[in-house]
């Protein structure tokens, strides 16, 4: 452990790291090293490895400091030499930034500290060195504010309170009679530093550290601590980032965007992160530091002239006003803009992906502080991948791999109805930070959003600006609206990464946290009122607006065609209605992997006949009721087979226990008694007789069919007679009849005999034959263990992984919520096994059944029909074990196709 290299230096075109060292140096550290190596101007610095973060939690803070001390001091000396200044020196001071950097991008989730190394003596030296006392004290007050928050824990006491430092700033500005931070003079900034330190001492009981090395170690440890803060943990859960990855810490020489009118800071993207358009775009602020842009504290200006004009149009600002008061960087700093544009092109070509970059201009010199593959919306993800393919920057397989299956879901989100929009009341407009349509009730705080969401309410978070502490609320909100911040603010970047609708920088809104109201151009809305956001054009509307299905782009279709070219795993859908079948077919499904017949029985007329069949006390009574059901079932099947013309439709025979279909309330029992001409008491007794202690392991599935063969006969006749009618109409139906819940070969044999006998009788009556297959669901562990025997009769297997998971783990799907959070928290389980297939247990049963089944029937078709069929990692496992297809709900078909 002691001999392990933990610190990697970079600067002046040299670096000890490379882009492929993300695991060791995190994304930020690896890319800073790489930028040095390809000639991009980057301030010198060093990166502490992710392994050190893990050691920090294993062996403790002081032990890690002792391990790091020698390497950090050596690396710091290298930075001092390159910058020709000295850390902590009162005449020629070097200031540092300390930033986090995990191997996967986690924007805003961990902590950053700027201007580190200042104290009352060093700040005077900085003022003399730069000849700019205002800049020096502005840097000092920013450092005390940031360090006090991140390292010393200065937070608002109550959620309604504003940041304690901002409260001090507001008070000083009020006393001075000014509105903007940059209107404060040197004496005001000195006063802020003093008041900040007093507030820290009062709230934390600790004095602000004056020793620069003590500050540095405090900052490094604070970044390691931030790996385990609540928002970082939540973000990792959302993104599937393992805790054991850890974060790196990057320490860099400070360059300053707040040294006057020739200095600036900004964030830019090589392509539009919201739409995917091939347009360089970004935001900048003159005389500011990077956190001002990202945190949304000030609404910045646009980098490009085109972007600036588009922004002004959205804000209702005239071209004359824009030129004078809101010029683009392209206009205000043309030479710096040219350099920036050249380097962003170079970086995108080098990484062959859309880049998200941070930069600072210090007195006319451009420095890059970061580049990373940019977070993007689902729509942008698809467009960027297909554009890069067309531009020859990536190949077809790379284009497929660049698209995250779960983000395709965003493309399928509804949009506002054009008809409904025509009569909607527009309140204001902001920046279209993340596209989509969102309707919900206004909430102002993250914890309220989470609580309301848990109660089943749709919410829209309204904030002055968001911070990483708001992540839990943003995660459950339908959309986010902010008064401040631009297209690169925290709200915008995180919302795009989550696929959430977001409107930012809506300057006309006035948010009052204390009274929980928001005023928008004279209209007052309170917490709980409905609001609608259009993240595509930045419009904000009062009330709820009706939505409709989104239209899919040509790039989406092209991506799906690529997927079909490179996969051998077919994707079917789980569908019980013609509409669902049509939707799935539009998304590329090549059949139905699960058609549940029980859902067809719950219409008003059908349920009466179904209940008559269940409650009948003899075979004749059941046959009479089933005769009523037959035409209904037949028509239902005709609609589904018609929608899936030419593709296989796998129909599962009746599966649920019968008690699910009978009335359990007095009124329903009275109506049933009247319809059947029997007493209420008779109905009550029959209903009670159907109740079971453990119905999911009771009288259901093939056990029903074997107890009441007439049910199987009716359903077989309905399926095949529907197909005969369609064949006569010129359609090409492909029926598959599936016996559910088989555990013993003889259960299946008995049902197969009934099915084939009924089919033979029907074909003789009609003078027409239909080719069909009979298979079974493998959802009982015993069926997997004896799959070779079952395959001697079954023509295909469909794995019902929902029930197979339930019976393998012994977990009830309906009751797991009572202990699952504890199991996930304690890492007893890594994921919910009903969401992600358990490959080591349930998955091995699937593999065993496939291998055993094909050992006796080499053409055995195998598929999966649980909702695992639409979960990307589960789909990949299905491909690995040799399944022929996966089946999932219609709107997850594109996700499964991409994952396959």
Per-region residue spans from a language model:
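Intrinsically disordered, low-complexity regulatory segments
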Residues: 445, 508-509, 557-560, 576-578
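Conserved alpha/beta-domain cores
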Residues: 99-100, 552, 562-900
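Short, ordered loop/turn segments at secondary-structure junctions
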Residues: 47, 51, 466, 485-487, ...
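Glycine-rich phosphate/ribose-binding loops and adjacent secondary-structure elements
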Residues: 365-367, 451, 460, 464-475, ...
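Nucleotide/phosphate-binding sheet-loop regions of phosphoryl- and nucleotidyl-transfer enzymes
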Residues: 1-424, 432, 451, 457-460, ...
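Structural motif
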Residues: 250, 443, 460-463, 481, ...
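Extended, non-globular alpha-helical segments
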Residues: 429-469, 520-558
């Amino acid at each position: 452990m002691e001999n392990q290299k933990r610190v990697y230096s970079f600067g002046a075109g040299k670096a000890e790291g490379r882009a492929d060292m993300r695991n060791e140096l995190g994304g930020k550290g690896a890319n800073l090293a790489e930028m040095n190596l390809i000639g991009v101007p980057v301030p010198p610095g060093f990166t502490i490895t992710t392994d050190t973060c893990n050691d920090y939690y294993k062996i403790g803070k002081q032990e890690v400091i002792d391990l790091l001390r020698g390497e950090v001091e050596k690396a710091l000396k290298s930075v001092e030499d390159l910058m020709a200044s000295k850390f902590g020196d009162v005449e020629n001071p070097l200031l540092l930034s300390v930033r986090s950097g995990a191997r996967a991008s986690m924007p805003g989730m961990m902590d950053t500290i700027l201007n580190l190394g200042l104290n009352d003596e060093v700040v005077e030296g900085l003022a003399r060195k730069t000849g700019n006392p205002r800049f020096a004290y502005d840097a000092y007050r920013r450092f005390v504010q940031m360090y006090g928050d991140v390292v010393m824990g200065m937070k608002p006491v109550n959620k309604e309170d504003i940041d304690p430092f901002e409260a001090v700033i507001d008070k000083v500005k009020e006393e001075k009679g000014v509105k903007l931070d940059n209107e404060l003079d040197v004496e005001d900034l000195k006063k802020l530093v003093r008041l900040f330190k007093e507030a820290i001492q009062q709230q934390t009981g600790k004095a602000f550290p004056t020793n620069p090395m003590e500050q540095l170690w405090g900052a490094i440890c604070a970044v390691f601590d931030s790996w385990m803060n609540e928002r970082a943990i939540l973000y990792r859960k959302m993104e599937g980032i393992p805790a054991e990855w850890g974060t790196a810490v990057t320490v860099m020489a400070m360059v300053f965007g707040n040294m006057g009118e020739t200095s600036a800071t900004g964030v830019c993207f090589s392509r539009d992160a919201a739409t995917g358009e091939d347009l360089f775009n970004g935001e900048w602020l003159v005389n500011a530091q990077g956190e001002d842009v990202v945190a949304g504290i000030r609404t910045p200006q646009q980098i490009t002239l085109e972007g600036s004009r588009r922004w002004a149009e959205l804000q209702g600002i005239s071209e004359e006003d824009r030129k004078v008061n809101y010029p683009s960087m392209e206009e205000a700093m043309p030479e710096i803009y040219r350099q920036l544009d050249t380097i962003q092109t170079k970086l995108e070509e080098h990484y062959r992906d859309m880049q998200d970059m941070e930069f600072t201009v210090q007195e006319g010199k451009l420095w890059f502080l970061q580049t990373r593959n940019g977070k993007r919306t689902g729509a942008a993800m698809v467009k960027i991948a297909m554009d890069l393919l067309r531009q020859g920057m990536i190949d077809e397989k790379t284009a497929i791999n660049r698209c995250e299956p779960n983000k395709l879901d965003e493309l399928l989100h509804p949009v506002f109805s054009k008809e409904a929009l025509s009569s909607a009341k527009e309140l204001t407009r902001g920046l279209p930070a993340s596209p989509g349509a969102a309707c919900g009730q206004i909430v102002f705080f993250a914890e309220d959003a989470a609580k309301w969401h848990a109660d089943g309410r749709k919410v829209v978070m309204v904030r002055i600006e968001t911070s990483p502490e708001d992540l839990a609320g943003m995660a459950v909100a339908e959309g986010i609206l902010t008064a401040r911040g631009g297209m690169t603010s925290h709200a915008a970047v995180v919302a795009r990464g989550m696929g959430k609708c977001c409107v930012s920088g809506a300057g006309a809104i006035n948010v009052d946290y204390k009274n929980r109201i928001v005023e928008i151009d004279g209209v007052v809305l309170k917490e709980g009122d409905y609001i609608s956001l259009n993240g595509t054009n930045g419009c904000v509307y009062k009330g709820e607006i009706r939505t409709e299905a989104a239209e899919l782009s040509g790039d989406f279709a092209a991506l799906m065609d690529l997927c079909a070219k490179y996969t051998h795993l077919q994707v079917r859908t789980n569908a019980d209605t013609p509409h669902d079948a049509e939707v799935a077919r539009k998304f590329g499904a090549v059949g139905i992997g699960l058609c549940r017949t029980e859902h067809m029985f719950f219409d008003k007329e059908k349920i009466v006949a179904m209940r008559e069949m269940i409650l009948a006390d003899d075979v004749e009574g059941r046959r009479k009721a089933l005769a009523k059901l037959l035409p209904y079932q037949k028509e239902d099947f005709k609609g589904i087979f018609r929608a899936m013309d030419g593709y296989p439709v796998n129909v599962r025979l009746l599966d649920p226990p019968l008690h699910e279909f009978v009335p359990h309330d007095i009124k329903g029992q009275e109506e049933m008694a009247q319809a059947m001409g029997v007493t209420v008491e008779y109905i009550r007794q029959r209903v009670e007789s159907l109740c079971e202690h453990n119905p999911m392991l009771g009288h259901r599935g093939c056990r029903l069919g074997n107890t009441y063969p007439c049910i199987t006969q009716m359903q077989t006749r309905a399926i095949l007679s529907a197909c005969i009618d369609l064949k006569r109409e010129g359609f090409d139906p492909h029926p598959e009849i599936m016996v559910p819940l088989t555990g013993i070969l003889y259960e299946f044999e008995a049902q197969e005999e009934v099915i084939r006998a009924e089919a033979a009788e029907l074909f003789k009556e009609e003078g027409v034959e239909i080719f069909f297959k009979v298979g079974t669901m493998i959802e009982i562990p015993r069926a997997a263990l004896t799959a070779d025997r079952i395959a001697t009769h079954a023509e295909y297997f469909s794995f019902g992984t929902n029930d197979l998971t339930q019976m393998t783990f012994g977990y009830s799907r309906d009751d797991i919520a009572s202990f699952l959070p504890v199991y996930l928290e304690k890492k007893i389980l890594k994921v919910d096994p009903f969401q992600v297939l358990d490959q080591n247990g349930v998955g091995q049963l699937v593999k065993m059944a496939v291998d055993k089944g094909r050992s006796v029937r080499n053409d055995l078709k195998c598929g999966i029909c649980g909702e695992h069929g639409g979960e990307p990692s589960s789909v990949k496992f299905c491909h690995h074990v040799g399944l022929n297809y996966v089946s999932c709900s219609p709107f997850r078909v594109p996700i499964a196709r991409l994952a396959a």
